[in-house]
């Protein structure tokens, strides 16, 4: 199973939790059954700690940046099964990564933090975990790896959800007339 993290790489986005959950799953014998790829800018002052932890895990890799301004970026993102988003960053608002995940059909494991429950739907586009809970993250990842979660159905739900944010569905002729642009 292929997990992905796509955001700023920093502790407050849950990166340490992902790495610890990965380590625990590896200790339980799941190492050859999943991978975790990280994309994003590594926060200043976190590079050494992050690299030390990720380099100790054979199935976790830093992939650099994913260009989502090009279709190929979304094609690459769609190769993943689940996105990991165990954030507790106090500045978290409407995370644009949700739309990226929806477009690519990638459901996520996310914390019950900030506005996540307003945008994501438990069991359809996401699986929720409590904030600051590595064991809950590990368990949700294990359920996905073991096939206990219908990821394919969730992927379809994500793609359906993406339609709500498609500019062609949002900016209609009726809206343009209403705001007197047409």
Language-model region placement:
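A conserved mid-protein helix/loop that constitutes part of the nucleotide-sugar donor-binding site
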Residues: 1, 10-24, 135
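A structural motif in glycosyltransferase catalytic domains
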Residues: 3, 18-21, 36, 137, ...
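Nucleotide-activated donor-binding/catalytic signature segment of Leloir-type glycosyltransferases, i.e.
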Residues: 48-69
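Short acidic alpha-helix that forms the nucleotide-activated donor recognition element
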Residues: 68-80, 103, 121
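Short alpha-helical segment that forms part of, or immediately flanks, the ligand-binding pocket
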Residues: 74, 96-103, 114-118
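Short hydrophobic beta-strand element within catalytic cores of glycosyltransferases
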Residues: 84, 103, 107-110
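Conserved acidic donor-binding segment of nucleotide-sugar-dependent glycosyltransferases
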Residues: 122-123, 127-134, 143-148
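A charged, aromatic-enriched C-terminal amphipathic alpha-helix characteristic of glycosyltransferases
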Residues: 149-179
